Design a protein with these regions (language model features):
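Beta-propeller blade termini and top-face loops
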Residues: 1-731
């Protein structure tokens, strides 16, 4: 999972605090041998920065909301403070900040704290800028309020004079279709009075639209500053100042790349070697001469996509780095790396389960960590360990699928619809991505393209682009069963930052997901001719004749729904051909309301079914029990909900779950297990939920109820695996034996 920040306790370097982009806050007291989650029951899951008070190492300040500008960024709930080393937290406000990138505690006054807030990514306004408190967080004042699209992305303090601070502002806006990652609001600022007043320090910087800036100050010579500046469309440069920001000199044209500077660009100055700086990037870039020349840091056997770098005070060879694949340690200045493999932080987008015997397998597509598979349980007393899991396909993983009755065939895909059929007996992967024909428009694939295997024929597949495709032979050939089901717009002509922008502005087209695509597909279990499709641009389409004719409905025809809402999920009812469910999502336009509707007359009329779901809760996926039509499960931004009356009422159903997005759910029908794909805390399984089918009002008022026992499999547990590997091997518990 993605690591946002790491803080090492200066008084006890065995103690680390880890802020996870989507996965909460964690603490180790033994250098990563064991871990304790610190915020599982808090109202947030996404964090951007963590700071240890220099006066009191039990005083921890936490900024929530990721500090990157990616399409899958987690949203925060302000600033939190702990006085007991993370055992408990107090809400300190700034709830509308959404993304906090840096917190600094005054080195002489613990009641004075500065907070760099990027502000909302998806909308204007909010609490963005440079906030200061002088009363320990009781009140805050925005000392650098630039405009409704510009926040502060980086902040450093002069180690010899706490009245001198430097800040980097960042103007940006993202929506479902596009990203502008820069603008005239982006600049560098300096304060000489403890952050009360700020002045621009941009002499020597270019006048073009600047994007994300990483800022660093030399610990040895604090008059020396470094700035990694994104310029226009993904270009950039590193600048150096020898006079405390009075002027800047361009050192090189270096900029972070990959998915774009908006995702990296943190700049770190070595505390041990003057003029040695590190630029976070897909691969870390290192300069030994103040930014003139950069080389790629050795990252052999280490995950890419770096975000955080931390040092120990008295060991120049030690490095602790946070990546999209977790935490790594080096004891020899990056010559080799040790993986901290016992943090369950994988970000799963989607999942699928097979029907392998004796234990079924779970497959999931992840952010930055491939498509992975593993067993639902093992024969070993020790449980399910890292070694039981395997990589099915590389890249960012997305929606997988399995073939009923044949666990040897699965489908896995990487981003933008690169779908493969995998033969699990020999590992053979065959691309089965549908392609447009001669003289047809280019096929558009969503970042997370939908695939489903037919209920009616396990060799029949459906796949979504801007069209719906059908294959009768496991993807060897495809036939389009629809035309373009989307609005087919020119996305650069859509308003962003409040208006239509010139093409010459700071668009980051490489960081944009393909737009005007199908995002969700469903087939009726009862009638193979009934199909539903939903799009990312607010359209629901359905056919009752196998794709010969489609009926179109825009989502603004649903009660209280904006036309921009993204179709996260659409499901045909398993028991009734006239009933279906749709989940909509408008958070990429700054709207966090839950939108969910049901039709019981084949799509002619839809009614809202969100009773019991709090405002501000995004809805991701819905599944229906295959036996009891009234029993529904719902994956949301903050856990799982259950309905016992076909969606009329919803109840939180997250006992044992941390606060985390549940992006997908699946039911393993043989075992009656509910499997969850979380975006930051890996998989969770609810074993045999079948008693919930009998949660009737009558049974709830009875003194007792005897449930039918489940069919059991007899087997002997064994000792084995890696149970003697020590605390750094992660184990998940097997279901209870016996």
């Amino acid at each position: 999972g993605r690591i946002a920040d790491i803080a090492i306790d200066p008084k006890n370097e065995n103690v680390w605090y880890v802020a996870v982009g989507s996965g909460g806050v964690w603490k180790t007291e033994n250098s990563g041998t064991t871990w304790t989650p610190l915020a599982d029951k808090m109202p947030f899951y996404s964090t951007g920065c963590i700071t240890i008070d220099p006066h009191n190492n039990a005083s921890i300040w936490l900024g929530t909301g990721e500090n990157v500008g990616g399409r899958h960024v987690g949203i925060g709930h302000g600033v939190y403070h702990s006085k007991d080393g993370g055992k408990s937290w107090k809400d300190m406000g700034l709830k509308k900040s959404e993304h906090i990138s840096k917190i600094i505690v005054h080195p002489e006054d613990p009641n004075t704290v500065w907070v760099a807030s990027q502000g909302p990514l998806w909308s204007p306004g909010g609490e963005r800028g440079l906030f200061k408190t002088t009363d320990g967080g009781k009140t805050w004042k925005n000392k650098l309020d630039i405009n409704e699209w510009t926040g502060v992305t980086d902040l450093v303090i002069d180690p010899t004079n706490p009245n001198v601070l430097y800040a980097a502002s960042w103007q940006k806006h993202r929506n479902v279709a596009a990203l502008i990652g820069g603008g005239p609001g982006t600049s560098l600022y300096k304060s000489v009075d403890g952050g009360d007043n700020w002045s621009k320090i941009d002499k020597g910087l270019p006048r073009s639209n600047k994007g994300k800036i990483g800022l660093a100050i030399s610990p040895m010579q604090p008059n020396v500053l470094y700035a990694a500046v994104e310029l226009d469309k993904r270009a950039g440069a590193v600048y150096r100042s020898n006079n405390s920001g009075g002027s800047w000199k361009k050192m090189s044209d270096t900029v972070s790349g990959g998915t774009g500077p908006h995702y990296y660009q943190e700049l770190v100055a070595s505390p041990h070697v003057f003029d040695k700086i590190y630029l976070m990037n897909v691969r870390v870039l290192v300069s030994d001469d103040g930014g003139k020349n950069f080389y790629t840091m050795s990252e052999r056997q280490k995950h890419s996509d770096n975000h955080s770098l931390t040092f120990k005070a008295n060991d120049p060879n030690y490095m602790l780095i946070g990546t999209d694949g977790g935490i790594y340690e080096s004891f020899d200045d990056s010559a080799s790396w040790k993986f901290v493999g016992n943090l369950p932080l994988t970000q799963f987008y989607k999942l699928a389960v097979d029907d392998a015997e004796p234990f079924y397998n779970i497959y999931g597509g992840t952010q930055d960590n491939n498509t992975q598979g593993g067993p639902s349980r093992t024969f070993e007393y020790s449980g399910i360990s890292n070694s039981h899991w395997f990589v099915v396909l590389g890249g960012d993983g997305h929606q997988p699928a399995t073939e009923p009755g044949n666990p040897d065939i699965i489908y896995a895909q990487s981003q933008q619809g690169y779908i493969n059929r995998i033969d699990m007996t020999n590992g053979e992967a065959v691309s089965v991505r549908p392609q447009e024909g001669i003289d047809e428009p280019y096929e558009r694939f969503n970042w997370d393209s939908p695939i489903l295997v037919s209920y009616h024929d396990p060799k029949r597949l459906y796949f979504g682009t801007q069209r719906v495709w059908r294959s009768e032979n496991r993807g060897d050939s495809w036939t389009a069963v629809s035309g373009d089901l989307t609005k087919d717009e020119e996305r650069l002509s859509l308003p962003i930052m409040g208006r239509v922008q010139s093409f010459d502005n700071a668009w980051d087209v490489y960081a944009m997901s393909t737009y005007n695509t199908v995002t969700s597909l469903s087939e009726s279990r009862i009638d193979e001719n009934i199909l539903y499709a939903g799009t990312d641009d607010g359209i629901i389409q359905y056919t009752r004749d196998g794709g010969e004719n489609w009926t179109k409905m825009t989502v603004d025809n649903l009660p209280g729904t904006p036309s921009s809402a993204f179709v996260n999920d659409i499901k045909a009812d398993l028991h009734d051909t006239e009933t279906a469910y749709v989940l909509l999502d408008n958070h990429k336009f700054g709207d966090y309301k839950p939108y969910m509707f049901k039709t019981t007359n084949g799509g002619k009329k839809w009614v809202s079914i969100t009773k019991g779901i709090p405002d501000g809760t995004l809805l991701w996926r819905i599944v229906q029990d295959h036996v009891n039509p009234n029993l529904l499960f719902l994956g949301t931004e903050y856990g799982v909900y259950i309905s016992l009356d076909q969606g009329d009422n919803w109840h939180k159903f997250s006992n044992g779950l941390p606060t985390i997005p549940v992006r997908d759910l699946a039911i393993q029908k043989r075992e009656n297990d509910l499997v969850l794909a979380t975006f930051g805390r890996s998989f969770y399984v609810l074993d045999d939920y079948s008693p919930l089918r009998d949660m009737t009002q009558e049974n709830l008022t009875n003194d007792g109820v005897i449930f039918e026992p489940r069919k059991a499999l007899q087997f002997n547990q064994i000792y084995g695996g890696t149970s003697s590997d020590g605390g750094q091997t992660y184990y998940a518990d097997n279901p209870r034996y016996g």
